[in-house]
Amino acid sequence: RTTFYNNIKIKGIEETEAREINGLPEEAQLSNFNWSPDESKMAFTNTIENGVQVYILDLETATAKRVTEAFVNANMGNPISWFKDGKSLLVNMLPATRKELINTAEAVPTGPTISTSDGSKAQNRTYQDLLQNPNDVFNFEQLATSALVKVNLDGTSTLWKDAAMYSDVSFSPDGKYIMTSTIHKPFS
């Protein structure tokens, strides 16, 4: 579950007043805050009606700038990692090959509903957030799959690693290596 913030301000240790940030989106839903390695900038996401965007906040000028369209995949943890040089980000983006999700309320069942002899549904154990049928598996795959894209501070981007179900992306302390963890079938 994600906590969203509708505004941020900055205040230096020696400053008495917090400064307003220029360039924040209207009706902001901000999350996934991430400091640059030199701590002069901060990357964060803004969730809008049709997706998630990445913004960069320059702390010296107190100005935020959007650097991606609403194609960020923030479904599996923090979608933003800074490269060691602080000049670019590694961002989990929706792949171009992403398919439409199956509407499970309208989908035709793939098998029978198990019921007791009196016609009521059989009592089964209930667990939260489990994949219960092939439609759930398909939807999970679509929601969890990201392409890793290198996004520069000016908003230009290049594909860094092809689409997979990345559960974690982390840089080594010296910034020379990146470890990615992926999820593979079968899921349980």
Name what the model sees in each region:
Residues R1-P37, F71:
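Blade-loop segments of beta-propeller domains
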Residues R1-N7, L94-V149, H184-S188:
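Predominantly five- to eight-bladed beta-propeller fold
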Residues G12-T16, D58-A62, N152-T156:
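Short loop/turn segments that connect beta-strands within beta-propeller blades
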Residues P25-T45, G51-V54, F71-N92, D118-Y127, ...:
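Conserved beta-propeller blade repeats
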Residues Y5, E49-G51, T61, T145:
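Surface-exposed loop/turn positions within WD40 beta-propeller blades
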Residues R19-I21, K65, T158:
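A structural motif specific to WD40 beta-propellers
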Residues N7-I10, V54-I56, V67, S146-K150:
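Hydrophobic beta-strand positions in blades of beta-propellers and related beta-sheet-rich domains
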Residues R19, L59-E60, A74, G86, ...:
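Predominantly soluble domains enriched in secretory-pathway, periplasmic, or organellar proteins
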